[in-house]
């Protein structure tokens, strides 16, 4: 008998299908941080909010004026769960108080990474989010089976060097898919 292990999507992108009804995920590109039999966690990487790094730093260390460059560092809506919790995706390299290596990209969750970015000594490339997307055991698999998502291999170029408004289409193009031509209906010839 063949031992079949499940396929997990850690370190991949999820592309929301055009018919995605949930407003938290419609037209999103999500990076999957973790996916196991117990559930999944991801960060939406193409929805900037009105906040920028300077706004966050004013709350974290009000005694220091944030450098002007921090106004140009966007903060993304990472998902609907724990929207007051910050996550920073950045290239593997520098380690901070809470950094996890995710196969060529790192996830840092401690404030020191934000201070390092602000002070010009942190990662040069980053995606900063507030909140995350979470799925219970079997939930993401069920959504995939109902054609809510396409999966796409991770690409650091899309994450760090593609403007946020183009990331979804760039991931779809990597699969040679035009999202405007997709439907939620299956047909038979």
Curated annotation (Swiss-Prot):
InterPro entries recorded: AlgH-like
- Which Pfam families does the UniProt entry name for this protein? DUF179
TM ranges: none
Q: Which GO terms describe its cellular component?
A: cytosol
- Per the similarity annotation, which family is this? Belongs to the UPF0301 (AlgH) family.
Q: Which NCBIfam families match?
A: PRK00228.1-1 (NF001266)
Protein's name in the database: UPF0301 protein PFLU_5755
Query: Which organism does this record belong to?
Result: Pseudomonas fluorescens (strain SBW25)
């Amino acid at each position: 008998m063949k031992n079949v292990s499940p396929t997990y999507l850690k370190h991949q992108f999820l592309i929301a299908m055009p018919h995605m009804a949930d407003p938290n995920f419609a037209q999103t590109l999500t990076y999957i941080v973790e996916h196991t039999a117990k559930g999944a966690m991801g960060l939406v990487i193409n929805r900037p909010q009105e906040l920028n790094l300077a706004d966050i730093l004013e709350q974290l260390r009000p005694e220091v004026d944030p450098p002007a460059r921090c106004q140009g560092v966007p903060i993304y809506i990472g998902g609907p769960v724990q929207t007051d919790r910050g996550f920073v995706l950045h290239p593997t390299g520098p380690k901070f108080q809470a950094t996890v290596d995710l196969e060529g990209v790192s996830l840092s969750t401690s404030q020191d990474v934000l201070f390092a970015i602000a002070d010009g000594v942190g990662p040069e490339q980053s995606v900063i989010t507030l909140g995350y997307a979470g799925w219970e055991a079997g939930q993401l698999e069920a959504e995939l089976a109902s054609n809510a998502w396409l999966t796409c291999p991770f690409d650091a170029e899309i994450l760090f060097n593609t403007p946020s408004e183009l990331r979804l289409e760039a991931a779809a193009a990597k699969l040679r898919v035009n999202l405007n031509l997709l439907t939620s209906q299956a047909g038979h010839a």
